[in-house]
Amino acid sequence: MKTIALFGGSFDPPHTGHIAIVKALKRLNYIDNVVVMPTYLNPFKSKSAANATLRLKWLKEIFRGDKKVIIDDFEVKQNRSVSTIETVLHLLTHYKKVYLVIGADNLASLERWNRFDELKEIVTFIVATRDEIEIDARFIKIEVNETISSSALRDVLDVSRLPSVCKDEILKVYKD
């Protein structure tokens, strides 16, 4: 059984920061695969700008041909908001170990996550740097030199931050 890094999120829209995180994860020699898993609906949000099926399609296009990256539709197929603990427990039936990847901006709310006490016992957290947020030494840290967020990108639609393979389609969806 393999060891994976679970990189979940809304990816609403996917951008160069997400790609940089995946590249950084692929360099970690103790991870066999990076599992990228879009949410059906983020548990902390009431809606997504782009529907889950479309976000899943974009991720498949972005990482097509990359043998270390697995695009997983588990959460999308649930047709509901899925908590991280539920996803991790599902993945542990298929993989030996799950590293859970989060952005440093999620650290402040981490303890409010559903069943966090259980979650922290079954995963090892990998935290991607973001802005100047301090990352506690108990977490594995990966350096990512991208400062964009999906919400900021929806506001400004900076084409240079969109993956080239699907940027036209992303622009069309978010401009409407």
Model segments located where?
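Nucleotidyltransferase catalytic core that binds NTPs
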Residues: M1-D176
